[in-house]
């Protein structure tokens, strides 16, 4: 729901368009941007919204004291001598000037991303405990916002009700006055509510219902740019005693055991592409082409598959054989199981804890991987938790392997790659920690 807005947004064709900014100018060297804001912008409580709100909000999001997961996204912006962002509002609050460290091809995309939206300073700092809990101001309904809708009521884990914001600058174009949402991690319950006529729209269905819905005109498949993946905790005891080379061989070997084709055909069932790179197919390279391709600058190790391995069903047994050899390199011993298959020796077992949230598709993926690992005698124990517990466990690094996924915030490969810096709030695999 559009409760907040930024300087920029996207039009119906996915192209950058102006939002709270009516125009911008960029310097010839690409190091400076100046946005001119629209006249008459208001917060939902009727107070004025201007460029100073963006100066405050961006510095708040980038501050280590706030601890925002997306603080690293502000790194393209230069810093002043006092450590604050080099972002300045004009005296009248009409213009916002930003100086960058270096030219940034995706800077306007950042200005359309929610982490770069403005938040109301007065409301933020009026909340009890705001200095220790940066989100205290918006944990209940009624908080001040800036978008098309405001949150009227919120029964946590059950429902949310949004109503039209009369102070939104495009309020005359908002045709739906009220939006009611059911909140549930149970996709079976959501689907039942939809079928009962209690919901007009549902964005998830149980895995075992997908096949029966493929020909239903009410069922729509929407493409997303992103990657569903397994995260290895690099500090896990799973890698204790291993050299960096052995740990890398082990991760690749375990990854090659996963039958991605089975997961896509029997669990996803809606045309997902097999992943063999972290940056997904279709992501732009910033120069008018696609990032994931073989060219003069780089050819993928598996050139035919345009990736690091061939994930197709035809390559399954080759991948299995390579996985066993890699695990041997990592120090694991294998024996014949009596049927001509190599399995792990009792002397060098592999026991893995895999965490996931309790959505039916995620659990099904975990169970498929459990069977894949069992093919060589490796044991995968699945721990399932509700969403918030799962997120906390993953962020704390309390796992060997974890289900993970990333839908691109904007169409540039840096969005998939910069999260793996040591100080990134999205560095769930614990690199550098």
Where are these regions (language model features)?
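Append "and occasionally in soluble cytosolic enzymes with long acidic Gly/Pro-rich linkers
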Residues: 246-371
């Amino acid at each position: 729901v559009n409760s907040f807005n930024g300087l920029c947004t996207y039009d119906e064709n996915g192209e950058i368009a102006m939002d709270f900014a009516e125009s911008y100018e960029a310097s010839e060297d690409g190091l400076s941007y100046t946005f001119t804001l629209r006249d008459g912008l208001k917060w939902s409580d009727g107070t004025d919204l201007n460029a100073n709100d963006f100066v405050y909000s961006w510095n708040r999001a980038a501050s280590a004291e706030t601890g925002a997961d997306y603080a690293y996204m502000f790194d393209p912006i230069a810093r002043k001598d006092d450590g604050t962002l080099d972002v300045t509002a004009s005296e009248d609050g009409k213009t916002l000037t930003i100086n960058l460290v270096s030219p940034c091809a995706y800077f306007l995309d950042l200005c359309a991303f929610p982490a770069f939206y403005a938040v109301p300073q007065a409301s933020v700092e009026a909340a009890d405990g705001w200095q220790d809990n940066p989100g205290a101001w918006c944990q209940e309904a009624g908080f001040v916002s800036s978008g098309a809708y405001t949150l009227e009521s919120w029964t946590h884990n059950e429902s949310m009700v949004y109503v039209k914001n009369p102070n939104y600058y495009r309020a005359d174009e908002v045709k739906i006055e009220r939006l009611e949402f059911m909140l549930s991690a149970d996709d079976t319950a959501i689907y039942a509510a939809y079928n009962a006529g209690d919901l007009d729209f549902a964005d998830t269905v149980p895995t075992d219902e997908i096949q029966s819905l493929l020909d239903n005109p009410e069922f729509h498949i929407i493409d997303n740019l992103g990657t569903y993946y397994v995260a290895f905790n690099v500090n896990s005891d799973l890698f204790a005693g291993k050299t960096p080379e052995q740990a890398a061989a082990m991760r690749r070997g375990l990854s090659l055991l996963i039958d991605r084709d089975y997961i896509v055909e029997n669990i996803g069932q809606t045309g997902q592409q097999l992943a063999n790179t972290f940056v997904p197919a279709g992501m732009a390279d910033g120069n008018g082409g696609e990032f994931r391709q073989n060219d003069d600058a780089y050819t993928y190790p598996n050139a035919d598959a345009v990736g690091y391995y061939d994930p197709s069903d035809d390559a399954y047994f080759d991948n299995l054989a390579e996985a066993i050899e890699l695990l041997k390199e990592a120090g694991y011993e294998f024996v014949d199981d009596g049927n001509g298959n190599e399995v792990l020796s009792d002397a060098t077992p592999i026991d893995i804890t895999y965490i996931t949230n309790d959505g039916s598709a995620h659990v099904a993926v975990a169970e498929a991987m459990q069977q894949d690992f069992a093919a060589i005698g490796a044991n995968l124990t699945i721990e399932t938790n509700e969403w918030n517990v799962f997120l906390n466990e993953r962020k704390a690094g309390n796992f060997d392997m974890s289900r993970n996924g990333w839908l691109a915030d904007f169409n540039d490969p840096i969005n998939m790659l910069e999260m793996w810096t040591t100080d990134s709030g999205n560095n769930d695999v614990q690199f550098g920690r």
